A protein has these predicted regions:
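Amphipathic, Lys/Arg-enriched alpha-helical "gate/interface" segment within cytosolic domains
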Residues: 1-118
Length: 118
């Protein structure tokens, strides 16, 4: 969690991950927190995901779809940065399978400002 202008944002940092193994490990680590939040019945998280300069493949995509299903249950708003090139197509796939609608931003600052806006 990060604090931004007196609001809490659940920041998922997948940036600069260059291997499948490292990405899958990070998804698993962040998954424990998501499960805990879901068990508490929380449904109003502001979520920011950063995948800038990260490597993605089909295996990672499958795990992100699973994570996305939980995020859908615990979030109020979702933002993502680092979406370029083929990642736009992968994001569309994730959104289709999870019914999540991430808003895409160029910078984390833009994303954070959008998340905290009422």
């Amino acid at each position: 969690m990060i604090q931004y202008k007196e609001k809490e944002i659940y920041f998922i940092d997948y940036s600069n991950i260059k291997t499948s193994e490292e990405f899958l490990k990070t998804i698993k680590e962040t998954g424990a927190f998501r499960e805990k939040v879901k068990a508490m019945g929380k449904k109003d998280l502001l979520i920011l995901v950063d995948i800038t300069d990260s490597y993605l493949n089909i295996e990672i995509l499958d795990e992100l779809k699973k994570a996305g299903r939980i995020i859908k249950d615990i979030s109020m708003k979702e933002a993502i940065v680092g979406i370029t090139g083929y990642k736009r197509i992968l994001l569309q796939i994730i959104q289709t399978f999870t019914n999540l609608h991430f808003n895409v931003f160029n910078t984390t600052e833009e994303a954070k400002n959008w998340l905290i806006k009422e």
